[in-house]
């Protein structure tokens, strides 16, 4: 004899309640994401970042791309700028431009982060007695083109440089600047990671791993020192129109460095881990919440194999 209602089916009520619980959970999660997104991307102002937390900002990799944009935006907000990069000529040019345009003080320190034993004592001396409110650890290098690990040109030297520039510079610069921030009970450390550090990226494996380190280091450090007034933020951009990314023309999803940095600074104090820019945040949420890591790795492999093939074909033709 057939049951007269679904309630008479054994276990039906359990499935119904489970469905209600699941739907409620997903609804609450979606609502939280929307509210949090509005808090960050609509209400965020970046008011925390400026001369009230310290007269000086220090920016590594400050003469190009995102680093240059951070230096100029922080100068626009009234902070004096210490620019650290490899080329003395480009540093002089950037310092003069910032000083004339924004009417702030500038200081330059020429340093090759790929040769760490030669630079940190000199950087420490150059930063001595400065009231540093913001440190932007931006300097970084990537591959010339996607490549299998053992086939990376000049592999041993490339590994040393990438680890020294992408990882050691972040640790050492933080070591130099953080004590002064703790002494004043305020400061902001912005560590520029990459969306490539959100999951493994085949054929950019070492670069991806170094950026994952920056992300983990930043979030751990923030937990250690936030109660003492220091904010540490991990910034994970997707593509930005820079020389490093080999993108010349900005688009809505590949913004100029200036557009990206203005947006990213508005998230300071609101997110300890940020993609920095609304279209990037949406992409980041999709790629980490909806796409399985295994699928993201497979897509990265397929994309980079294509880029590798095109690069090698072009190199062979030349």
UniProtKB/Swiss-Prot annotation:
Positions annotated as active site in the UniProt record: 207 (proton acceptor)
UniProt cross-references to PANTHER family, sorted A to Z: RH59310P, VERY-LONG-CHAIN 3-OXOACYL-COA REDUCTASE
Subcellular location: Endoplasmic reticulum membrane
Keywords: Endoplasmic reticulum, Lipid biosynthesis, Lipid metabolism, Membrane, NADP, Oxidoreductase, Steroid biosynthesis, Transmembrane, Transmembrane helix
Phylogenetic placement of the source organism: Eukaryota, Metazoa, Chordata, Craniata, Vertebrata
Main location: endoplasmic reticulum
Protein name as catalogued: Very-long-chain 3-oxoacyl-CoA reductase-B
GO BP term, pick one: fatty acid biosynthetic process
Biological role: Catalyzes the second of the four reactions of the long-chain fatty acids elongation cycle. This endoplasmic reticulum-bound enzymatic process, allows the addition of two carbons to the chain of long- and very long-chain fatty acids/VLCFAs per cycle. This enzyme has a 3-ketoacyl-CoA reductase activity, reducing 3-ketoacyl-CoA to 3-hydroxyacyl-CoA, within each cycle of fatty acid elongation. Thereby, it may participate in the production of VLCFAs of different chain lengths that are involved in multiple biological processes as precursors of membrane lipids and lipid mediators.
Family note: Belongs to the short-chain dehydrogenases/reductases (SDR) family. 17-beta-HSD 3 subfamily.
Membrane spanning residue stretches: 15-35, 187-207, 281-301
Catalytic activity reported: a very-long-chain (3R)-3-hydroxyacyl-CoA + NADP(+) = a very-long-chain 3-oxoacyl-CoA + NADPH + H(+); 17beta-estradiol + NAD(+) = estrone + NADH + H(+); 17beta-estradiol + NADP(+) = estrone + NADPH + H(+)
Binding site for NADP(+): 54-83
Sequence positions that bind substrate: 194
EC number(s) per entry: 1.1.1.330, 1.1.1.62
Gene name of the encoded protein: hsd17b12-b
InterPro entries: NAD(P)-bd_dom_sf, Sc_DH/Rdtase_CS, SDR_fam, VLCFA-Steroid_DH
Keyword Flavoprotein: no
Pathway the protein contributes to: Lipid metabolism; fatty acid biosynthesis; Steroid biosynthesis; estrogen biosynthesis
